[in-house]
Amino acid sequence: MNKDNVKLAIAPIGWTNDDMPDLGKENTFQQCVSEMALAGFTGSEVGSKYPRDPAVLKPMLDIRGIQICNAWFSTFFADGLKEKTIDEFINHMNFLHAMGAKVIGCSEQSKSIQGTTKGVFEEKPYFSDEEWQRVADGYNELADIAKGKGMQVCLHHHMGTGIQTTAEIDRYMSMVNDDVYLLFDTGHAYYSEGSQQAMMAILEKYLPRINHVHLKDVRDEVVAEVKANKLSFLDGVKKGTFTVPGDGVIDFRPVFKLLDERGYKGWMVVEAEQDPALANPFEYAVKARRYIKETAGI
């Protein structure tokens, strides 16, 4: 891949899990970002332990050569909470802008079961036509607001949400304006659709409108256990549904090849949440960085 086009980041969720703070509670913010840099990454997303004052956070990252590239934002348009979502989005956007980020990765969390004990496949939510329209209108408005700061909004398709499957991604992308983008996540695409082919089809179809990429691998044997026992998303994470690129079933070589051939410019973020007591975050960060160097050449 062209190293002038692509930068590599890693998410802090491997050190401390924001959805389950007990996973990795012993890992400090400074340990986390120091190990990111030591493993060879130059970017990070924002975790729950990160200072939220740019004047405090930026120097701590600068000294380690780490840049903020994105931070999760939850939207609740389908639930009808448009004004509250937009007010909170503006504060979030201003923080990311101050940190030098260009992308705002959002997830539509109305009816989401990702943080509950419900079976991630059996009890996933579905939106009504009216709710879909609220989501599309809301994201179009967020994109207009972000444009004023020279930033772009993207939707993170995610297990346990109303925008998870290929069909749901298709519907979302057909309803929003062209200046609303997609955050492509290899792990969530594979987990939802069950095959490399289906994952690649999403990437190929929407690559011109993908402005942020999450790299996570999947352990098929854990997915099989999740399905067989009707486990929740978080139960799956604790058992090891996800891991870093090169440690699971996904072949990332065609992913990197397609991104390179189509001239993708932006961040690729290793975002692979698992139990840090079972998968040492630093060791797995190094493993991911080596795999990317070997397979993507960057």
From Swiss-Prot:
Family, as annotated: Belongs to the IolE/MocC family.
Gene Ontology BP annotations: inositol catabolic process
InterPro entries: IolE, IolE/MocC, IolE/XylAMocC-like, Xyl_isomerase-like_sf, Xyl_isomerase-like_TIM-brl
EC number: 4.2.1.44
Lineage: Bacteria, Pseudomonadati, Pseudomonadota, Gammaproteobacteria, Enterobacterales
GO molecular function: manganese ion binding; myo-inosose-2 dehydratase activity
Cofactor(s) named in the record: glutathione; Co(2+); Mn(2+)
Cross-referenced Pfam families: AP_endonuc_2
Substrates-to-products reaction catalysed: scyllo-inosose = 3D-3,5/4-trihydroxycyclohexane-1,2-dione + H2O
Coiled-coil regions listed: none
Gene source species: Serratia proteamaculans (strain 568)
Swiss-Prot/TrEMBL keywords: Cobalt, Lyase, Manganese
Top EC group: lyase
Designated name of the protein: Inosose dehydratase
PANTHER family: HYDROXYPYRUVATE ISOMERASE, INOSOSE DEHYDRATASE
HAMAP family linked to this entry: IolE
Top-level taxon of origin: Bacteria
